Amino acid sequence: MDDSKLRYFASAWLISITLPADSAERYNAQFVNGIDPLAFNQFVASDGDVMPGTYDVNIYINDLLVDSRPVRFSEDSAHGGLAPCLSAAEYIRYGVKIDDDHQPCFALSQTIRQAEQQLDIANHRLIIHIPQQYIEHYPRDYVSPMRFDEGINAAFVNYSYSTDANNGDGGSHQYQYLSLNSGINIASWRLRNNAYWNKFSGQADKWQSIASWAETNIIPWRSRLVVGQTSTDNSVFDSVQFRGVQLGTDAEMRPSSQTGFAPVIRGVANSNARVEVRQNNYLIYSENVPAGPFELNDISAVNRSGDFYVTVIEADGSQTTFTVAYTTLPQLVRAGQWNYQLSAGKYHDGADGYAPALMQSSLSYGLNNTFTLYGGALAAENYRAGAFGVGSNLGEIGALSADYTLAGTTLANGQRKQGGSVRFLYAKSFLSSKTDFQIAGYRYSTAGYYSLSDAVNERRRWHNGLYENDYWPSDEDESWQASAPQHYYTSWFYNKKHRFDISARQTLGKNSAFFLNFSQQNYWNSSGSDISLQAGFNSTIHNVNYGLYYQNTRSHFTHDDNSITLRVSIPFTLQENRRINTAFTLAHSKSSGTSGQAGVNGTLLDDGRLSWAVTSAYDDTSHSTNSASLGYLGQYGNLYTGYAYSKSHRQASLNLSGGVVAHRGGVTLSQPLGSTFALVEAKDAQGVGIENQTGVRIDPFGYAVVPQSVPYRVNSVALNP
């Protein structure tokens, strides 16, 4: 079972009845659902004993579920009752320390005298107890690979559609955006495609396929094979996208105790707004949000590195932009573990121009409980690189990694450059001071060093002996708005020099916290820097939540913006699942001036699946905007609608999102799908809810989709009448 596979659950009510020891056991077939009463009587003898035969059972060894399959049972003349027919090889796969006698039925009790076996036919269980010294030691959350389920054959589409219509003094226009993540599961193979469509009134629509690939698991190696468009990991080299073939470790197959990361994007909308997120030239996210602070925690990165460029488009058409840095600390590997990745294909990042063939390998090994060794090699057209590093668990000091990369590059003008880059990464939580350094990193590169992406961009920007560079108009005009870049030409290329990143959180008392995210990138042949700074303070006093936030974004090509925001909210709980929250916001930014807003929002219905909000906003030009929105988490998808108006402007917006799953039982509509989801079958249970799933109910055909499940883990699904 994989993080992009579909799993199938069938529900059944099972009841076990135990009578006093001096009484023969009797079974009532009506209490054992999922078994025909006539068939039940065929395997229960007249004296109450279970008859020999083959039964579908869940196999438990020392209370750990290790397998689910048919098992043949025969009479046990030595001990009475029934004995399962399991081979020694099967017991070994279940973690029992025995030798393989190559016989179809291994006599467990003859080899391990203290072993006990019991068939619980009412609950479809084969219960085996074995002394611990005969059992391999597994982590507490271990799941046997034999239980990994490839899932059913199925097809699905996960969609998100948003549109807004605007009318104002400048005329009328409409914007539409549709994101489709689709897939087909056939046996152990999974075919996937991510694509989007968008259209702005008066312009031609645009359809783009972002990525297509096929993948399958190689469970004995705890690995995954991918064919198509994917990206290399960033544990050694910077991650790059490519089209080709990749084989590598899938760490999620390991237990949680033996084993990642996407940034949460935060901001403030002054009115009903659309938020767009771009990475590596792709529009990867577009969502309508109501006025007030927003938090995007479901971003799927196109690449494992590459900053996120966020644009907030307000109801009146004004825009603000900022950058969220995306860097991660390579995970330390446990002693004796290996992580590897082999990639081969052609560079593909969504942009036109030079795209070299490449081959890359990376390997990390847990030398002991303190040190991890890692390194790799990268070969591409006009480019070679090798790297080696050491990661260390320093105990109370924290976790630190250091690596060095040596690279040789042939530039577009034929010059051969060689240089090195050293990188340090650090992470530490100081419990005594409640300080958490989630990421602290520094990289320095010599003038002759080019990463692969730098080498590709150097050739793409080369035109008639000069390099083309982008820049934005001067930001001295405080009414500056995001616009298309302009170009100028130089005789040198701005390759990266040094970069510093830090992400930290400081807890203050019981109800307060301060956070800081900072990134700075400097370049050779340029005195400017790219800077991104986000800082904030959150606290609660007597049920009143408040926060102060600061944000600054600066490009080494002139444009910059900064903002400061004060937010106060007071929640009220009327009754269970019916909440009201009042919020007040005051903000000032270089690009938008001063603005403020006040609003009320809440939830309705028994499970809180209906949300609503009303907001009034103003700015320092006496321009006010009023807005209202409704959101609904439905059985067949999610709906959001909003309306905003001012003296000179009107905007109506709509979001529709959900999933469509086609399977052998038909077609089932659902809420938006995660990368792993489950299909539930419960006939004659129309309208019954699923436990811990807001808005998810059994449809008229007896099916429902649980949109989020955890891969390679035991997931519990239950009906909630």
What residue spans do the PLM features occupy?
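Outer-membrane beta-barrel translocator/channel fold
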Residues: 204, 229-241, 401-496, 548-567, ...
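Residues that define the transmembrane beta-barrel architecture of outer-membrane proteins
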Residues: 172-178, 206-210, 261, 336, ...
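Post-signal-peptide, soluble extracytosolic/periplasmic N-terminal scaffold domains
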Residues: 2-6, 10, 15, 22-258, ...
